[in-house]
Amino acid sequence: MGFLKNIKFMKKGGSNPLLEKLKLFYNALSAPFIQREEEAEVIVLSLLSNEHTLFIGEPGTAKSAIVRRAASLLKAKYFYYVLNKYTEPDELFGPIDINELKTKGIYKRRIEGKLPLAEIAFLDEIFNANTAILNTLLSLLQERIFINGDETIQSPLISLFSASNDIPDEVELRALYDRLLFRHHVRPVSESKLKELFKAGIEIELKGVIEEEPVMEISELKKIQEQVYFVLEKTKDRKDILQQYARLIVIFREQGIQVTDRRAIKGLKAVAANAVFNGRDYVEPKDFMVLKYVIPETIDDFGKVAAIVSEEIRLPSRYLKDLEILERNILRLRKEIRRLPTYDFRIISYSRELLIIERKLRKIAREAIDDNEVLNRVEKLLEIIGEIKDSLVSKSSLYGKDL
């Protein structure tokens, strides 16, 4: 699945201004962060789908920062809170209006600046939500309504983003987990990107976070959401797409991945959002790759779902898992070779291993000729191999002979 910065949004007669705005929004959202393009993608998909998201992973991976930036770039009303086991409803939904209670006997909350009036929200440690909070939160997520005394308020909430270290086991939390359509396992920045991360971090420490002007309005986002529903409507008549989608759902279930009927239906909405996200008003089989953010129930499912979809739709992106393994081996070799003394006998075996990896990379590049993401990763890994070769040459004149 390609990222928006690599997509040209076109429609008959010229460019589409709204989709150009969406591309600008995505680029501005991901720009300050190192290796957080995928998280930005999930945020955009969630907003386009008018659905909610769970980020799973350890603290300190910029989850709340990138969501806050999304709200800022949209000039959206934003609410943020870290939940614990003792969080009271007042903290999320507003304190009781004592005046209303005294004068009218109505149990009403003062909701200004609280979750019911937010357009984008982030709840950290969401599964700390207790029983007193759960029912109200579920109504807000599912129906976008908040009962406030004798008044039913329609919440403007577009998407709620949340974070947790783990997936909940408790039965009472499963309904909440199910309401979060998008699920993404956030990993720390890879070793190859650490220098960039440090530089960016130092820049923030010295100059602070620079706030950018909004690049898109909520009203424009809602118009693009209408396009998602238009694509979803068209998909009803796409027998080829529905047949392939049904096959995927069957395979997921056969592989032991639990997919409820409701999640399967919602998954089609995510697929339609991905088509719009990539500048199309129709679904293609490659849009099914978005299911890696929708179908997983456990941590182990994330890799499994991506592999199943890649294999079934024959996408070049099935090579991404292979590239991750090759990258780990390359970085291991670089680390071990740096420690070698000159003329060490292991240089020959390392050279041969490096050559095998290089051949595998070039084979992947030939087979995935149309996948820019794969080709870019191959190119970067080949550059690292080139650097390692230079290091080997400096350690032993035998290197060239043994390749």
Regions found by a protein language model. Give the residues of each.
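Conserved alpha-helical scaffold flanking the Walker A/P-loop in AAA+ ATPase domains
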Residues: 42-45, 99-121
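Walker A/P-loop
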Residues: 44-85
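Conserved NTP-binding/hydrolysis module of P-loop NTPases
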Residues: 84-104
